[in-house]
């Protein structure tokens, strides 16, 4: 195990800057997930840590050692790619032991490591099979096992579940999390799927356009996003945003007016807000309530209803919203397309964002989050 530290790291291809002034501290034994949309620089950053890409400027440390000029094979990292990259003519044992054989490791040591990895990954009964005889999930476990036998100080995983179907992704998600807890290893995992990030990570790094947008525990990012990008990216379905006008301001609450003229107080830090400002009000679909329970009521035409059995998602057309407002309720809701529906907004679950995307600090204390 080892810590990983990035100090003002930048990566450029010619004049195009991909990773921009990245500062990160990843502790020993921590499971960290890099998440963000396509093209945000998350895989590039992982490849810089692995040594597959040169760092343009800044410093990378693994443990106490500066790694900028150290070749990949000597960094003590192991990498699992989106592609399984298994040798089709070799059985599982030979695939998993290939790197150790290349390094001329002792035969007994090779056998010991492969057997241990196979036991952990539940592959012991498959060691004589060729990759073509395996399922997608089993092939992915072999790829992880090949990295595991090299006993790296840091595991790097670049979108390892992207090629799997939805049900298998859920299963492998749990297995990788269990493996990391069992080994206590330092693991850095790249994904564009915020659900993977929320369910697996000790700490999430949200990337946007090469910059680190926010770093924190999953529930910190969910309940207390520092900007509108993180608020909209973390959570599924995404957060609803509505344009509001600021009517009054106090140090620990702000009065907002919706497009329908309804006003209510939102418990946020008001020190950066001015009367008359136009701002974005954010509220998550699962935090909306019935009209009787809300501090403010909005109504709109029902456009789409998704009845999933365990929950219902309703898409409402609302003039003041940036897109259809999504209302999410457990169980089945008796509503159909074309109906008018009133829903309530609970003030204490609301977020408030400046025009430049900065969030006002929320003052309501959510369960499960240390502040």
Curated annotation (Swiss-Prot):
InterPro entries: AAA+_ATPase, ABC_transporter-like_ATP-bd, ABC_transporter-like_CS, ABC_transpr_MalK-like, ABC_transpr_MalK/UgpC-like, Mo/tungstate-bd_C_term_dom, NA-bd_OB-fold, P-loop_NTPase. Its main location: membrane. Keywords: ATP-binding, Cell inner membrane, Cell membrane, Membrane, Nucleotide-binding, Sugar transport, Translocase, Transport. It comes from the Bacteria. GO terms for molecular function: ABC-type maltose transporter activity; ATP binding; ATP hydrolysis activity. Coiled coil: none annotated. It catalyses: D-maltose(out) + ATP + H2O = D-maltose(in) + ADP + phosphate + H(+). Its EC number is 7.5.2.1. It is an enzyme of class 7 (translocase). SUPFAM superfamilies: MOP-like, P-loop containing nucleoside triphosphate hydrolases. Residues 4-234 form the ABC transporter domain. ATP binds at residues 36-43. It is a peripheral membrane protein. It is found in: Cell inner membrane. CDD domains: ABC_MalK_N. Belongs to the ABC transporter superfamily. Maltooligosaccharide importer (TC 3.A.1.1.1) family. Part of the ABC transporter complex MalEFGK involved in maltose/maltodextrin import. Responsible for energy coupling to the transport system. The complex is composed of two ATP-binding proteins (MalK), two transmembrane proteins (MalG and MalK) and a solute-binding protein (MalE). PANTHER family: MALTODEXTRIN IMPORT ATP-BINDING PROTEIN MSMX, MALTOSE_MALTODEXTRIN IMPORT ATP-BINDING PROTEIN MALK. NCBIfam families: PRK11000.1 (NF008233), PRK11650.1 (NF008653). This is Maltose/maltodextrin import ATP-binding protein MalK. It comes from Vibrio vulnificus (strain YJ016). The gene is malK.
């Amino acid at each position: 195990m080892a810590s990983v530290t990035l100090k003002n790291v930048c990566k450029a291809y010619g004049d195009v800057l991909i990773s921009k002034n990245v500062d990160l501290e990843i502790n020993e034994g921590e499971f960290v997930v890099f998440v963000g949309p396509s093209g945000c620089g998350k895989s590039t950053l992982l490849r810089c840590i692995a040594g597959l890409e040169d760092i343009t400027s800044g410093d990378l440390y693994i443990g106490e050692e500066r790694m900028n000029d150290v070749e990949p094979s000597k960094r003590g990292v192991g990498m699992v790619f989106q592609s399984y990259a298994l040798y089709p003519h070799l059985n599982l044992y030979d695939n998993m032991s290939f790197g150790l054989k290349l390094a001329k490791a002792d035969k007994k040591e090779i056998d010991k490591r492969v057997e241990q990895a196979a036991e952990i990954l539940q592959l012991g009964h498959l060691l004589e099979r060729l990759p073509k005889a395996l399922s997608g999930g089993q092939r992915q476990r072999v790829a992880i096992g090949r990295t595991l036998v090299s006993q790296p100080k840091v595991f790097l995983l670049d979108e390892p579940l992207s090629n799997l179907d939805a049900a298998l992704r859920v299963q492998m998600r749990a297995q990788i999390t269990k493996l990391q807890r069992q080994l206590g290893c330092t693991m850095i995992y790249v994904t564009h799927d915020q659900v993977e990030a929320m369910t697996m990570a000790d700490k999430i790094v949200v990337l946007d356009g090469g910059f680190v947008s926010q770093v924190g525990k999953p529930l910190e990012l969910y309940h207390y996003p520092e900007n509108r990008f993180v608020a909209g990216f973390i959570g599924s379905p995404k957060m609803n945003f509505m344009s509001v006008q600021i009517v009054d301001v106090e140090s620990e609450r702000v009065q907002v007016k919706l497009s329908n003229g309804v006003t209510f107080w939102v418990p946020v830090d008001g020190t950066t807000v001015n009367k008359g400002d136009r701002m974005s009000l954010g509220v998550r679909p699962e935090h909306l309530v019935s009209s009787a329970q809300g501090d403010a009521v909005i109504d709109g035409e029902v456009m789409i209803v998704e009845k999933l059995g365990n929950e219902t998602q309703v898409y409402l057309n609302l003039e003041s919203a940036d897109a259809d407002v999504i209302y999410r309720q457990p169980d089945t809701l008796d509503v159909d397309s074309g109906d008018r529906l009133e829903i309530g907004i609970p003030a204490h679950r609301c977020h408030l964002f400046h025009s430049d995307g900065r969030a006002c600090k929320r003052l309501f204390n959510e369960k499960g989050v240390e502040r």
